[in-house]
């Protein structure tokens, strides 16, 4: 079953300076993190605060999901970090 993103929930995790979201491969959850630097690369004019990071995520959701799918297809692991070079 291909990776999907049926749950649009996302939140900013201040401890890791990243927006966390999940994808699903059948019944398996795949947690993803996209860090501040990666978000800044795809949305250069964003504000560096929680609302700015979440807005940058929302404005680029489809691009982020496409990149997350590519990162996921590289190999399964406990969680996945989307880095600036992935974009």
Where are these regions (language model features)?
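Short, charged/polar N-terminal "headpieces" of proteins
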Residues: 1-23, 28
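A short, structured beta-strand/loop element
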Residues: 18-44
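A generic short-segment signal for beta-strand/edge and adjacent turn/coil regions
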Residues: 1-4, 8, 32-33, 48-53, ...
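Generic structural "secondary-structure junction" signal
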Residues: 7, 41, 84-85
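Intrinsic-disorder/low-complexity peptide segments enriched for small residues
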Residues: 1, 37, 80-81
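Acidic, low-complexity intrinsically disordered segments
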Residues: 45-87
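Amphipathic alpha-helical interaction segments
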Residues: 13, 20, 40-41, 65, ...
């Amino acid at each position: 079953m291909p990776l999907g993103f049926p749950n649009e929930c996302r939140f900013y995790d201040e401890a890791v300076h990243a927006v966390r979201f999940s994808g699903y491969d059948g019944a398996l959850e795949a947690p993803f993190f996209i860090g501040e630097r990666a978000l800044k690369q795809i949305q250069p004019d964003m504000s560096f605060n929680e609302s700015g990071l979440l807005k940058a995520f929302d404005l680029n959701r489809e691009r982020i999901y496409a990149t997350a799918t590519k990162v996921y297809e590289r190999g399964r692991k406990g969680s996945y970090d989307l880095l600036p070079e992935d974009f």
